[in-house]
Amino acid sequence: MAEANEMASAFEAVLKTGDFGKVQELALTHAADDFVQEWPQSGERLTKAASVRIAEQYSEKSGTSPKFSYKRMLGGGDLFVVEGTIDYGDGIPVSYVGIGELRDGKVTKMTEYFANPFEAPAWRANFVERM
């Protein structure tokens, strides 16, 4: 458990820098050999090797260097959740939630959700508080 706490502290420190590349680098350093990354919104599943290749080529191929804004990280045992926003260079904060699973101090699975902001429907205005 101490190993997981040390890893969580390292992740939190890097997440707070906002440097997306460093976040990816640290994540892959702590990934198990059988690591799987899933992006449900685009229907993609990546192996550790594919994640490494995407991280290496991301800025060049996408034309952007995303910046991460850390909100919080929660978890315990073999599960953790990261919440934040990502700016892909256009100034639009994309909401991010990542759910990580651990085994023997290594990340075995990371499921990540990305959501662009959208205007709430007018019919809900009487039921909600605007943030």
Regions found by a protein language model. Give the residues of each.
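A beta-strand edge to alpha-helix "cap/lid" segment located at domain peripheries
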Residues: 3, 53-131
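Short, flexible micro-motifs
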Residues: 21, 46, 108
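Hydrophobic alpha-helical core bundles mediating ligand binding, dimerization, or RNAP-core interactions
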Residues: 8-15, 31, 51, 55-59, ...
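A solvent-exposed, acidic/Ser-Thr-rich amphipathic alpha-helical stretch
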Residues: 24-76
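Short acidic-aromatic low-complexity motifs
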Residues: 2-34
